[in-house]
A protein has these predicted regions:
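Conserved phosphate-binding/catalytic region of the ribokinase-like
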Residues: 102-219
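Conserved N-terminal subdomain of the carbohydrate kinase-like
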Residues: 1-42
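Active-site donor-binding loop signature of nucleotide-sugar glycosyltransferases
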Residues: 17-19, 91-93, 137-138
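Conserved beta-alpha-beta core of the PfkB/ribokinase-like small-molecule kinase fold
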Residues: 42-107, 123-125
């Protein structure tokens, strides 16, 4: 796929897209071999623009953790249908108020997805994880191009958190009480550190043309 944009004072303004190109015309059909391969990974990430919604049940039924980027599409019917198959829902929601975003998070959790990452542009990000709501202010820089900032936050947060989560444990009762001894406490620290890292990584993306340095001027 491709998407032409204008860059106005560092902010990307979409002019259109080719609507997913070949992926939309010929969507992926996952085989048993594909599922077996994907089971090697901690997380499977996809999006509303990948056109594999009918395949999500296959992934969740195989016990795979799936994160899904809804972009800025707030379709209650789609949320209700897909959320039961997701481990984490990701959304871009800078146009909504804080209260509206809280309601959106509650709705997604109610529909069966336990975790939510919600990016809000210059208002930062909200993460609902392990039954708790966290917030992170943005790391503000002189932006060259904001294309991909939200995607960068999502990627950096999820990879960082899952990497640290594997080490979060409840310690057995023993002499002394120094450090983090409870799994829940360690996970809370992991969430906050991961959000901090994600904000910094997203800021670095804003200083690259075309998100990762390969933007092309059209015309």
């Amino acid at each position: 796929g491709c998407a032409p944009v204008n860059i106005i004072e560092g902010d990307r303004i979409f002019l259109g897209s080719n609507k997913g190109g070949v992926t939309k015309k010929h969507p992926i059909e996952l085989t048993a071999l594909d599922i077996d391969y994907l089971s090697q990974f901690d997380l499977i990430h996809t999006s509303i623009f990948s056109y594999i919604d009918p395949q999500l049940q296959k992934l969740s039924s195989a016990g795979l953790r799936v994160s899904y980027d809804f972009s800025n599409q707030f379709d209650e019917t789609r949320h209700r249908e897909l959320c039961p198959h997701l481990w984490c829902a990701c959304l871009s929601s800078s146009e909504r108020s804080y209260e509206e975003n809280c309601e959106l998070i509650n709705q997604i959790v109610k529909f069966g997805c336990p975790n939510v990452v919600l990016t809000r542009g210059t208002d930062g990000a909200m993460v609902y994880l392990n039954g708790k709501l966290y917030e992170q202010s943005p790391y503000l820089v002189a932006a060259t191009d904001t294309m991909g900032a939200g995607d960068s936050f999502i990627t950096a947060f999820l990879t960082s958190y899952l990497d640290m989560d594997r080490y979060c444990r409840d310690f057995p009762i023993q002499k002394g009480g120094a450090g983090l001894l409870r799994q829940d406490d360690a996970r809370e620290v992991a969430v906050r550190i991961s959000m901090h890292k994600a904000a910094v990584f997203a800021a670095s993306t804003c200083q690259q043309d075309g998100s990762f340095g390969y933007g092309h001027k059209k015309g």
